Amino acid sequence: MILIYVRLFMELSEVSLICKALSDQNRLQIIYLLTYGEQCACELLEQMKITQPTLSHHMKVLENCSLVIARRKGKWSHYSLNRDRWAAFRGYIESIRDEDREKGESRCSL
């Protein structure tokens, strides 16, 4: 059943890449901040209290797994959450949770 969900939402290699990207607390915080809407790099820097090179590194990781979309406006980059990608990832995680429930129920009936 899980393999069906993986094909519907995203490839397992993509899920793995996203999990790796989310394994850092700074990147988790960035995702959280972007759930409120597009943010300029300057706004993220101010809220997170990190350096510009550190932010650039984290944004590159999030862009590489397509969780974040970047666009230039003047001298600053503006970032937004790729909501379709985020929804697909969440759908995969929820499918695991649902599968665990089904397995848990069937174990008791054996």
Label the model's feature ranges.
Residues 1-14, 85-110:
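Amphipathic alpha-helical dimerization/coiled-coil segments
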Residues 3-5, 15-16, 51-53, 61-63:
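Short secondary-structure boundary micro-motifs
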Residues 5-9, 34, 64:
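Compositionally biased, intrinsically disordered low-complexity segments
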Residues 13-54, 73, 77-85:
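N-terminal helix-turn-helix DNA-binding core of bacterial DNA-binding proteins
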